[in-house]
Amino acid sequence: HERTLPFEIPHEICYGKFGRYLGGIMGEVATGGYDLGIVVDPDVDRLAFIQEDGKMYGEEYTLVSVADYILDHVKGATVSNLSSTRALRDVTERHGCQYFASAVGEVNVTTKMKEVGAVIGGEGNGGVIYPESHYGRDALVGIALFLSSLAQKGVTCSELRKTFPTYYIAKNRIDLTPDTDMDAILGKVKERFGSMDDVQVTDIDGVKLDFPTKWVHLRKSNTEPIMRVYSEAATMEEADALGKELMDVVYEMTK
């Protein structure tokens, strides 16, 4: 069954607003007896799946699933950017391998992959980078590897999803004035949380605070006076609360 999907899909895949664009294919998969649905963006470098029950598989779990399949066959490092799900780290360590984080952006991910000799990497927006093919996000490669995993394990899409830890990512933004010194604010956030025993601070791209069971990542925009706040936890409510907590911290620092 052919599907014509609007070019705005990559942005919707990134930010989770699926209903407006993907409702049609989700309903078709759920009622049409399909094993899965496949969604790509116009330049075919981002990839998301629809489960056989019509639910979103989760674009963050595209890379996680493919990495799990690769690590079943070849042991090695994995890489994703700082704003991607912690599930990749969990799966990588489950295979006895090492996970590395890079700054956001495909070039930063591939640079880190080459540096550590990663066997698989990518971004949580559904971007899969498989060095055996080439150093670039490629949805077709991701599709082939994902289907191979389903076939090898003999499971449905929803059954495969249940084998991975579940996290939820909340995405917020802080609107600031053009004269706000965002670098100074990020420095204050790093200083404030850096002395805490249960927080790991990473500052290669904004400031990311890793807590034992959750994280929050603050990044400034290079084109407008806003700061993006991504946070992840075991529930969406907890993830959003963590993001809002850091937003309050930043707003307080601007007074």
For the regions a protein language model found, what residue spans apply to each?
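Phosphate-binding and adjacent anionic-ligand microenvironments
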Residues: 36, 74-255
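Generic hydrophobic alpha-helical segments
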Residues: 21-29, 67, 109, 189
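Short acidic-glycine loop/turn motifs at beta-strand connectors
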Residues: 41-42, 51-53, 211-213, 222
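N-terminal small/polar loop signature for handling phosphorylated ligands or for N-terminal nucleophile
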Residues: 1-50
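Short, charged, surface-exposed secondary-structure boundary motifs
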Residues: 4-12, 68-70, 109-113
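Short, acidic/small-residue loops that bind anionic groups at enzyme active sites
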Residues: 56-73, 77, 103-104
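Short, ordered loop/turn segments at secondary-structure junctions
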Residues: 1, 42, 54, 61-62, ...
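Short Gly/Thr/Asp-enriched flexible loops that form oxyanion-binding sites at enzyme active sites
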Residues: 45-64, 88-89
